[in-house]
Amino acid sequence: QVLAFMAMKPPTALAPQAISEEKNKVFRSMEPIRPSDVVRGQYNGYRDEPGVSPFSDTETFIAVHCELDNWRWAGVPFYLRTGKQMAEGMRIISIAFKEPPRSMFPADSGVGSAGPDHLTFDLADESKVSLSYYGKRPGPGMKLDKLSMQFSTGETDYAGDVLEAYERLILDAMRGDHTLFTTADGIESLWERSIPLLDAPPPVTPYAPVSW
């Protein structure tokens, strides 16, 4: 869902059907998921949980490298990660901007020293948007530092009106609004592209609870 919303083209209308059509185009353009592009993990102690088999191979963490075979996104990697018992609960979308082939700044200015510019969406209940970029350090000379600008709905007059994630989904389900849901066609497309992974999943790697 997150991948589709980030990669989809503008819909013809701000309506569930039009948005779902564009999301399904993204799903259909996905390359098959190769087992070599997937990491599966299981936190230590999971098999001791009530109702869990001591031989369980179920993952509690997964990281996937995806690519889209279309004109706009060909060659651009997408990385999806989700897991339980992480060091912190986060819902983040981070877009890294590709560095230009040449820079007008001097080699010793510090440009690129802290990685590429990022546009980051924090989808937690108090949603935030931040942009990291390089800016000139005050004073003579040309030295650049990594700076950041941020907007947070928690700092607006409407902070109390923000719905929690499941509140929004339940409300949309009651209203019959499937904008945030995957259609049957979308699920089928994703299932087809997951067949190589389902046929030969990589082994789970143990990791410590409350860790990265």
Give the role of each language-model region.
Residues Q1-W212:
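Secretory/organelle targeting and membrane-embedding segments
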